[in-house]
Amino acid sequence: MSKTLLIMAAGTGGHVMPGLAIAKTMQSRGWNVHWLGTTHGMENRLVPPSGLPMTLLKFSGMRGKGWKHTLLGMFRLVGATWRAWRLMRELQPQAVLGMGGYVTVPGGWAARLAGVPLAIVNADAALLMSNRALVKHAKRVLFGFDGGAATLGGMAFKARVTGNPVRAEIVEIASPEQRFADRQGPLRVLVVGGSLGAQVLNATLPKALALLPAEQRPIVTHQSGAQHIDALREAYAAVGVQAHVVPFIDDMASAYADADVLVCRAGAITVSELAVAGVASILVPLVVSTTSHQRDNARWMAEHGAAIHLPQQEMTPQRLALLLQELTRTRLLAMAHAARELGRPMAAETIANELESIALPVQGGKHS
């Protein structure tokens, strides 16, 4: 009889995509996988093509919207925990894995109530708020990076640094030495703004490149997101700078392999991909009032010599132009080496091993 894993992941692609990679690995080991998500996150678009059965909870957190929202959120949290507990009674999973998103808190508490071993993945360098609520209930806390958060203080016995799962085609990218072997001419800069486009990158890059003498300008590919592509093309044209502006990049592995350096945000999965691929980067983290995870990710990469951390408030055209002007292929190759040293290409397999180490036997365990 097959074992069952319940994966909890909701909200962003950074939570969902690694969960799908782990699901595929567990299925290859003979496990059944069921997904627990929310009614409004990206899991509703990303999970169905995989064919995984999915249960959705109506829960969207409790922070930042006044005491009435908090009170209502508490009631919804109790209700979501109850529904998750009933699901576990029905599925009788041997293990539960939390990948992040609002669903992990009620799902994690339900796992504790149902007596099912819980593992949580902390993709970022800093400990996620939702994971802080679950650390004491988890059998394993699996970290994407080996920063200070991975010590877990007095609960270090639960912590494992596994890395974050990345796509197979990223793992297969040639080494930095092979890629840089015959490169000549202008540097190749890849700007990645994500599906919605990072507006600070769109606003700054054309102006920064215009400050460079024409003979010193790099070859630029700028992924803008569909919403901003026309305005970005006009911005480059207005300052007389040539750039290949695209809404999306379908083959990201080839784009990574062709680039000397990326300019991008510092989400956990992006940083993990840069490390596994061995690509130098200028990281401009998104910092909002409720979280600084990207800043911590960027600092971690910079401290290891794998990236340049450029805080958004310091990202002026003048500062970026100076950074680009100072970069050489020799320096970028050294950064690419440092990034590659940080990569954990076997993260999905390592996480699968940890799940199997804590799993209940098919016929045993307490589910009450």
Swiss-Prot record:
One of its GO terms (biological process) is cell division. Its main location: membrane. It catalyses: di-trans,octa-cis-undecaprenyl diphospho-N-acetyl-alpha-D-muramoyl-L-alanyl-D-glutamyl-meso-2,6-diaminopimeloyl-D-alanyl-D-alanine + UDP-N-acetyl-alpha-D-glucosamine = di-trans,octa-cis-undecaprenyl diphospho-[N-acetyl-alpha-D-glucosaminyl-(1->4)]-N-acetyl-alpha-D-muramoyl-L-alanyl-D-glutamyl-meso-2,6-diaminopimeloyl-D-alanyl-D-alanine + UDP + H(+). It comes from Methylobacillus flagellatus (strain ATCC 51484 / DSM 6875 / VKM B-1610 / KT). Its EC number is 2.4.1.227. The keyword Membrane applies. Transmembrane segments: none annotated. One of its GO terms (cellular component) is plasma membrane. NCBIfam families: murG (TIGR01133). It holds the Pfam family Glyco_transf_28. Keywords: Cell cycle, Cell division, Cell inner membrane, Cell membrane, Cell shape, Cell wall biogenesis/degradation, Glycosyltransferase, Membrane, Peptidoglycan synthesis, Transferase. It comes from the Bacteria. Cell wall formation. Catalyzes the transfer of a GlcNAc subunit on undecaprenyl-pyrophosphoryl-MurNAc-pentapeptide (lipid intermediate I) to form undecaprenyl-pyrophosphoryl-MurNAc-(pentapeptide)GlcNAc (lipid intermediate II). The gene is murG. One of its GO terms (molecular function) is UDP-N-acetyl-D-glucosamine:N-acetylmuramoyl-L-alanyl-D-glutamyl-meso-2,6-diaminopimelyl-D-alanyl-D-alanine-diphosphoundecaprenol 4-beta-N-acetylglucosaminlytransferase activity. Pathway: Cell wall biogenesis; peptidoglycan biosynthesis. It is a peripheral membrane protein. This is UDP-N-acetylglucosamine--N-acetylmuramyl-(pentapeptide) pyrophosphoryl-undecaprenol N-acetylglucosamine transferase. It is found in: Cell inner membrane. Belongs to the glycosyltransferase 28 family. MurG subfamily. UDP-N-acetyl-alpha-D-glucosamine binds at T12, G13, G14, R167, S195, I249, Q294.
